[in-house]
Amino acid sequence: MITFIIVLLVLVGGYFLYGSYVERVFGPDKIRKTPALTMADGVDFIPLPTWKIFMIQFLNIAGLGPIFGAIMGAKFGTASYLWIVLGTIFAGAVHDYLSGMLSIRHDGESLPEIIGRYLGLPTKQLMRGFTVVLMILVGAVFVAGPAGLLAKLTPEYMDVTFWIIVVFVYYMLATLLPVDKIIGKIYPLFAIALLFMAVGILVMLLWNHPALPEITDGLHNTHPAGLPIFPIMFVSIACGAISGFHATQSPLMARCMKNEKYGRPIFYGAMVTEGIVALIWAAAATCFFHQNGMEESNASIIVDSITKEWLGTIGGLLAVLGVIAAPITSGDTALRSARLIVADFMHLEQKSIAKRLLICIPIFAVTIGILLYSQRDAAGFDMIWRYFAWCNQALSVFTLWAVTVFLVRAKKNYYITLFPALFMTAVCSTYICIAPEGLALSDYVSYIIGGLCTLVAAIGFVSWYRKQNSIVYEKI
């Protein structure tokens, strides 16, 4: 329990200390007008209250990640605590903050456009296709799951098909309508419910004072299947430490902020909050595994068991609400992000409903196609979905390298993103080699390949960096 309390305090302290330092490195301009004010269109560029933006950003980036990912990551032992804390402070929150602030500086541009500015046109084109496919995949996946749960809670005539239609109609409305009409109204409520559930679990942890692993016991790998901590744990716990998906969501809120000074509490703060939620659930899962063994691999069952046992009936209701609402609120903003990404590279203004429909109809059609495929061939789709975890972290690699280039050109401390970029390069390159859904190579060979990929990236950066001294860049 001592280790848990210490790392929890370190996480909070990281927001005030390292978060403040990262903010100074970027240098927010409190006088500069934001896109929400200069480009207001009543649809995507709408000034919103800061507290509401924080809640929306938190729910956008959270979803089920800090709960399910942390629970599965807890099987690796105390190392999961360290990754959540250090990953959040030095990688995830930095990644979210700087990508969000760059979006503000570049008129609310979506992630592929930002990456393209700093990594070149070929990378921009790759990221345009990559992120749109990723967003549509997320949107499709997070329809059937919640629909199945809702079908179990409602009368027989409200079957899975009925709820799939209801959820998808909601997705269509949330993707098309102005951000303040649906997302701005219901997201804060769902975010409060998710936070309330986490706070309740934290109170019970402190009250019951269960035996939790301490760092003094060592960082032994306790995973029942013997999966290696590196790189598997660093991909399993994504949203609770660093996730590329977050950078696709930050531009949504970058278009609603009224002042750059709110960037740290919104972008860095939302990520730290998510890290706290992940840490709480990792500790709770540790208690569950200690009492029931590690055979259970269904995170939904673990969440249901913990909340009902610790929080009673209300906790059970919150668990159901969270497990249903979290994926839905990830799916709708994923499709909204897809619309904005396409609008950016096609240079289509989105004030007109006709222009929005022009983009959304193909997106909805592809999403429905993927959804139907997932229902007909669950095994085949499951294999596709397994790659999401790797693709998600690969996206964070591109984002970190792009931000590193920005910091170099702006003559700022680029080490704050260079080291995370190198580390995540090692994680992703090793994971795709070692994972069963990847090349399924031996640990030894995978580590060598991962190390070589990281070395090549480092050498490439040093070579590029040496050419930068003679180049003068504009200040953004």
Segments the model singles out, each with a brief description of its role:
Residues 65-71, 107, 134-147, 237-257, ...:
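Membrane-helix boundary/coupling elements in multi-pass transport proteins
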Residues 5, 9-27, 130, 146-150, ...:
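Membrane-interface loop-to-helix entry segments
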Residues 2-19, 73-103, 112, 315-316, ...:
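Extracellular loop-to-transmembrane helix junctions
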Residues 139-165, 174-175, 194-221, 406-414, ...:
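Hydrophobic alpha-helical segments and their helix-loop junctions in multi-pass secondary transporters
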Residues 10-67, 259-262:
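Membrane-interface "cap" regions at the ends of multi-pass membrane proteins
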Residues 49-65, 202-210, 218-281, 321-330:
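Hydrophobic, membrane-embedded alpha-helices of multi-pass small-molecule transporters
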Residues 205-215, 268-305, 375-379:
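Extracellular/periplasmic helix-exit of transmembrane alpha-helices
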Residues 11, 15, 91-107, 111-176, ...:
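Helix-loop-helix module between adjacent transmembrane segments
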